[in-house]
Swiss-Prot record:
Compartments where found: Plastid, Chloroplast thylakoid membrane
Assigned protein family: Belongs to the PsbB/PsbC family. PsbC subfamily.
Residues given in the record as [CaMn4O5] cluster binding sites: E355
Annotated source species: Euglena gracilis
Residues modified to N-acetylthreonine: T3
Domain of life of the source: Eukaryota
Mode of membrane association: Multi-pass membrane protein
Transmembrane segments: 57-81, 122-143, 166-188, 243-263, 279-300, 435-459
Keyword Nuclease in record: no
GO MF annotations, alphabetized: chlorophyll binding; electron transporter, transferring electrons within the cyclic electron transport pathway of photosynthesis activity; metal ion binding
Protein name: Photosystem II CP43 reaction center protein
Cellular component GO terms held in the UniProt record: chloroplast thylakoid membrane; photosystem II
Phosphothreonine carried by residues: T3
Keywords: Acetylation, Chlorophyll, Chloroplast, Chromophore, Manganese, Membrane, Metal-binding, Phosphoprotein, Photosynthesis, Photosystem II, Plastid, Thylakoid, Transmembrane, Transmembrane helix
């Protein structure tokens, strides 16, 4: 029997003495064998794509068309529906076949990637430099690594432009702001004004500003993807064709572990940005598929009770709550008419079911009394009872105890999982960045294990 303390333990034909890393260090054992590292890279991509395809088909098999997606614990089908596949007016699923096709295509792709990963891990050359010079690299070849970065940027840019093409020419995307309840439509006139697109980056993240999370137009979303796609492709060609400047060479650490830390930091940043986006934004993440946001559920409850009590004869304009403030309507810090009660904290909420009832100074009292449509009432009642909040009493004025059993709003799951994973990626970034910098400076000593008692233990057998 081999034990954890046996340095000669061989996994995948590599041991601690030949690689400098123990078996549990994973791909660190492949740091100097580019061919095998490519195999691990491709196999990892295959696993990701396999999960995507398998989970996609799992969700299709369990999907019930009569129920909203957000009631069924789905996280992949809402993304496909947002892209305009299989859905129509009001987010109604018309055909699940596009979902099925997407899952099968991912499974086929994962098989190709899996074969490539196994081939390069077991049968391919140890290093690419000898057999495939174009694909070969070493960690110190700065020009080559800059070109690899450029290739990655080009592919990311093409992905962003592909979304723009789908929205403009490939059948359109789902727009929750379409009058009367949302629909799939082609974005024929995306906004390309740089002051509008990049203005989101300098907006405050607080209150009614909301940084990039406040985007509420598909024209802005697609226009932003066009800008990002062009910038990424342009930057990719720049890095492919140019050499790193001297100040770049001096600033960055050039080693495999340093590149790993940069990548982990980038993924962590994207994960942290995704958290408020999926939690607050109902344009990119339509509530028809992902369920209401927290503020949306709270505002929906206030709206539902306002409509109910108004029909019972209440004067919604003058009724006061127990604090003396307006029970149904009140003034916001900026002077707008907003919903009263505990939902006042969400006064800056914007949603497609509520915006038709606004006027030049917030909610329009005349519209609330005379123009409320049945679809708005139904949607508000539905969102009120599906808040992304788990509580035994109430949060933000939303009574959630009725839904606390056997219901998790997809926004809760997606926001929490992205935050937790982004945090771990960020910790990994700090860890590997510290190790890479220490190694570059030359004072990385590691832990002194010469006196560890484990070194004196005999194998168990």
């Amino acid at each position: 029997m081999e034990t954890l303390f046996n340095k000669k333990l061989t996994v995948g034909g590599r041991d601690q003495e030949s690689t400098g890393f123990a078996w549990w260090a994973g791909n660190a054992r492949l740091i100097n064998v580019s061919g095998k590292l490519l195999g691990a890279h491709v196999a990892h991509a295959g696993l990701i794509v396999f999960w995507t395809g398998a989970m996609n088909l799992f969700e299709v098999a369990h999907f019930v068309p009569q129920k909203p997606m957000y009631e069924q614990g789905l996280i992949l089908l809402p993304h496909l529906a947002t892209l305009g596949f299989g859905v129509g007016f009001d987010g109604i699923v018309l055909d699940t076949y596009p979902f099925f096709v997407c899952g099968v295509l991912h499974l086929i792709s994962s098989a190709v990637l899996g074969f490539g990963g196994v081939f390069h891990s077991l049968a391919g050359p140890d290093t690419l430099e000898e057999s495939f010079r174009f694909f070969g690299y070493t960690w110190k070849r700065k020009k080559k690594l800059a070109a690899i970065l450029g290739i990655h940027l080009c592919f990311l840019g093409l992905g962003a432009l592909l979304l723009a093409w789908k929205a403009m020419y490939g059948g359109g995307v789902y727009d929750t702001w379409w009058p009367g309840g949302g629909d799939v439509r082609s974005i024929t006139n995306p906004t390309l004004n740089p002051f509008i697109i990049f203005g989101y980056l300098v907006k405050s993240p607080f209150g009614g500003e909301g940084w990039i999370v406040s985007v509420d137009s598909m024209e802005y979303v697609i226009g932003g993807h066009i800008w990002i796609g062009i910038l990424l492709v342009s930057g990719g060609f720049w890095h492919i064709c140019s050499r790193p400047s001297p100040w770049v060479v001096r600033t960055f650490v050039w080693s495999g572990e340093a590149y790993l830390s940069y990548s982990l930091g980038a993924v962590a940043t994207m994960g942290f940005i995704a958290v408020p986006m999926v939690w607050f934004n109902n344009t990119v993440y339509p509530s028809e598929f992902y369920g209401p946001t927290g503020p949306e559920a709270s505002q929906a409850q206030a709206f539902t009770f306002l409509i109910r009590d108004q029909r019972l004869g209440t004067n919604i304009a003058s009724a006061q709550g127990p604090t003396g403030l307006g029970k149904y309507l009140m003034k916001s810090p900026t002077g707008e008419i907003i919903f009263g009660g505990e939902t006042m904290r969400f006064w800056d909420f914007r949603g497609p079911w509520l915006e038709p009832l606004r006027g030049p100074n917030g909610l329009d009292l005349n519209k609330l009394k005379n123009d409320v449509q049945p679809w708005q009432e139904r949607r508000a009642a539905e969102y009120m009872t599906h808040a992304p909040l788990g509580s035994l009493n109430s949060v933000g004025g939303v009574a959630t105890e009725i839904n606390a059993v056997n219901f998790v709003n997809p926004r809760s799951w997606l926001a929490t999982s992205h935050f937790v994973l982004a945090f771990f990626f960020f910790v990994g970034h700090l860890w590997h960045a510290g190790r890479a910098r220490a190694a570059a400076i030359g004072f990385e000593k590691g832990i002194d294990r010469s006196r560890e008692i484990a070194r004196k233990l005999k194998p168990l057998d």
